[in-house]
Regions:
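Acidic catalytic/metal-coordinating carboxylates
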Residues: 49-52, 75-78
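Non-catalytic signal-transmission and effector/linker regions of two-component phosphorelay proteins
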Residues: 1-18, 125-142
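Active-site beta3 strand of CheY-like receiver
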Residues: 60-66, 71
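A Lys-centered signature of the CheY-like receiver
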Residues: 120
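The feature encodes the CheY-like receiver
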Residues: 29, 72, 90, 102
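Two-component/phosphorelay signaling modules centered on CheY-like receiver
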Residues: 26-45
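Alpha4 helix (beta4-alpha4-beta5 surface) of REC/receiver domains from two-component response regulators
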Residues: 33, 78, 101-116, 129
Length: 142
């Protein structure tokens, strides 16, 4: 049924959650990706700017986006707005990461649709734990 209707079944079949990591710092993207790969429960894609993040969300339909707020083109808040404006993406969780922590800015991100926020720098393990919490899944003890 799902294949006939163009609904991707690969993630369902693998039982893995789909994760999109968005940050313009490729080293950090690689670190985050490694952390989630070690957990073993994620199918991962990455993007380095807001435009690619928007395209990635539409095509990949991730369960979770780890989203840097300060991107070179479209900021994270705008990416949140775009994801939240598409009812087909209602189930996508967004975890914003940033070095800036002004309370009103974090509040603006939440209003734009972010589910959670973590301040940089953070331990990758803590990020994976937060992500698993957002997705209501247990961390694997790999």
């Amino acid at each position: 049924f799902m294949k006939d209707n163009g609904i991707p079944t690969d993630a369902l079949e693998s039982g893995k959650k789909k994760l999109l990591i968005v940050d313009d710092d490729q080293d950090l993207v690689d670190l985050i990706k490694d952390g989630f790969e070690r957990d073993g429960q994620f199918e991962i894609r990455t993007a380095n700017n807001g435009f690619d993040a928007g395209m990635g969300v539409k095509e990949f339909r991730p369960d979770l986006v780890v989203l840097d707020v300060m991107l070179p083109d479209i900021n994270g808040k705008e990416v949140c707005h775009r994801v939240r404006s598409d009812p087909a993406l209602d189930s996508v969780k967004i975890l914003c990461i940033s070095g800036m922590v002004e309370h009103n800015k974090v509040e603006e991100l939440r209003e734009a649709g972010a589910n959670d926020f973590m301040q940089k720098p953070f331990a990758i393990d803590d990020l994976v734990t937060r992500a698993c919490g957002l997705l209501e899944m247990e961390r694997s003890l790999a």
